[in-house]
Each structure stands twice: as C-alpha cells, then as structure tokens.
C-alpha cells in the first residue's frame, strides 16, 4: 500500500511539473507573439507616416520601387508561403524568426530612436532564444554554421531625409520582415498549444 502511494505521489508530482512547464512555455510564446505584433504595428505606422509626408509625385515614384527591391533578409532561408510555413517544424520557425530579428540589430538604429526599436528587437531576440533552447532540449541547433546576412551597409552610408528611395526600402523591408516573424511565431505558438487547428 505504501509503495502504491509513493508511485501515485511521483505520478501526480510529474503531472504538475509537466503542466507547469507547458503553462510557462505558452506564456513565453504569448509574450513573443505580443512583442512582434507590436513591432509589426509600429512598422506599419512608420510606413504610413513616411508615405503621408511625401508629395504626390514622390509617392507615385516610390510605389514602383519596392516590388522590385531586394531586402537584406531575402538571403535568409525562410519558409515561403502558407503551405511551406505550415509544413515547417516549430524549431525551424523559431530559428528563422531569430535570424530575421538578428538581421535588424544594426539597421534598426536608422529607424528612429523615440520608439526604442533596437531595444524591442533585442528583447524579442532574447525571448526567441529561450524558446529555441526549450525546443532543443539537448539537441544540436540547426544551421549552426549559417552566416548572418550582410548588414544594410548602403543604407548606413546614404540614409538621410533627402534619400527617399533608401528610406522607403528600409521601412518597407522592416515591415515585411516583422510580418514574416509574426506569422512564424503565431504558427509555432499554435503548434505548441493544445489547439489542433493551426491553419493560416
């Protein structure tokens, strides 16, 4: 009888521990999604404010640029489209999100200090890093030898109020990448929850 009670105690304790770990994991995912949603909204607002300040002729000229423009982060391997995102593992989505955020560490300094974007990105990167460690659980990280995409060096040298084209590209790419990360983290969060429907 005593042995049965001991076994039951161990089982109950392990269940509580497992449930606690699940709740903590969900809390971390929720926090990461909220943070990237805020950054995406911030990027959209900055883009809107930038476009509103343009003259009609400037707006018309710039609207033709971005669809043909290359973003620095395009060199980062990432799921393309809904189907590929759905098929990607949680670890792959987290790793891709981490690299996208990391690629903005230096360029974000050109996006304006009032909103503390660099600090927000650093916090999000740290949170995603914790989630990756939780998913790895002793495994080796994937793509360890991936080299980070080169920074937006041309933007650093020429970005100014007078250089509308590069300002527009930088803001457009930032908004595009924050949308990607928001999508990847939302799918990863859903996969780690009890929700069986994680369609986009």
Swiss-Prot record:
Which GO MF terms does the UniProt record name? growth hormone activity; growth hormone receptor binding; metal ion binding
What is the disulfide pattern of this chain? Answer: 71-173, 190-198
| Gene Ontology CC: one annotated term | extracellular space
PROSITE patterns tied to this protein: SOMATOTROPIN_1, SOMATOTROPIN_2
The processes (GO biological process) annotated in the record are: animal organ development; growth hormone receptor signaling pathway; hyperosmotic salinity response; positive regulation of growth; positive regulation of receptor signaling pathway via JAK-STAT; response to L-arginine; response to peptide hormone; response to starvation
UniProt-recorded name of the protein: Somatotropin
Which residues are noted in the entry as Zn(2+)-binding? 38, 182
Answer whether the UniProt record assigns the keyword Ligase to this protein.
Answer: no
Its job: Growth hormone plays an important role in growth control and is involved in the regulation of several anabolic processes. Implicated as an osmoregulatory substance important for seawater adaptation.
- Metal-binding: is it a keyword of this entry? yes
Localization recorded for this chain is: Secreted
Q: Which UniProt keywords apply?
A: Disulfide bond, Hormone, Metal-binding, Secreted, Signal, Zinc
The entry assigns this protein to a family as follows: Belongs to the somatotropin/prolactin family.
According to the UniProt entry, the coiled-coil residues are none
| Gene that produces this protein | gh
Signal peptide segment: 1-22
């Amino acid at each position: 009888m005593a042995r049965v009670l001991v076994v039951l105690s161990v089982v109950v304790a392990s269940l509580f521990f497992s449930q606690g770990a699940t709740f903590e994991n969900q809390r971390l995912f929720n926090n990461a999604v909220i943070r990237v949603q805020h950054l995406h909204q911030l990027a959209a607002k900055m883009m809107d404010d930038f476009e509103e300040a343009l003259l009609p002729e400037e707006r018309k000229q710039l609207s033709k640029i971005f669809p043909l423009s290359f973003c620095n982060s395009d060199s980062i391997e990432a799921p393309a489209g809904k189907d590929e995102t759905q098929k990607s593992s949680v670890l792959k989505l987290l790793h891709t999100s981490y690299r996208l955020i990391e690629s903005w560490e230096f360029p974000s300094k050109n996006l304006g200090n009032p909103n503390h974007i660099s600090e927000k990105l650093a916090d999000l990167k740290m949170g995603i890093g914790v989630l990756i460690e939780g998913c790895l659980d002793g495994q080796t990280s994937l793509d360890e030898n991936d080299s980070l995409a080169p920074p937006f060096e041309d933007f650093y040298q020429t970005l100014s109020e007078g250089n509308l084209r590069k300002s527009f590209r930088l803001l457009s790419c930032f908004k595009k990448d924050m949308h990607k990360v928001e999508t990847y983290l939302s799918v990863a969060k859903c996969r780690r929850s009890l929700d069986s429907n994680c369609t986009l």
